[in-house]
Amino acid sequence: SPQFDLDKQACLDYFESYFGFIPDYIGLMVDDAPRALEGYVLMREWSLAENLLDSKHVELLLCTVNAAEFGSRFVNVHANGARNAGATEAEIVESVLCAIPVSGVASWLPGADGIMEGRAK
């Protein structure tokens, strides 16, 4: 099985490179749950980078999933990731609209909030 050498700094570097900053919820894990932080980095690395889909489509898919869960905060995170991976605003909007058949029109409002929050930055 693959071996991964992650320490706290490598984990922080990962999030700094993805977000451009260290989110508060990551900071909570750094000192109090370093093994959970390592696992979270490995899960993200596999799901976002080491799969058959390109990063733009992974981020768009995660916009859909998070909109279906009414999660505007994480729609924002992944909409920004999709932008960084080359997605157009129309593709991001369409990815959130794809949640409607699963979660209903109510998924549009938090999804739209997440999209617009990222545009404001």
Residue ranges and their predicted role:
Residues 58-72:
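Amphipathic, charged-and-aliphatic alpha-helical interface segments
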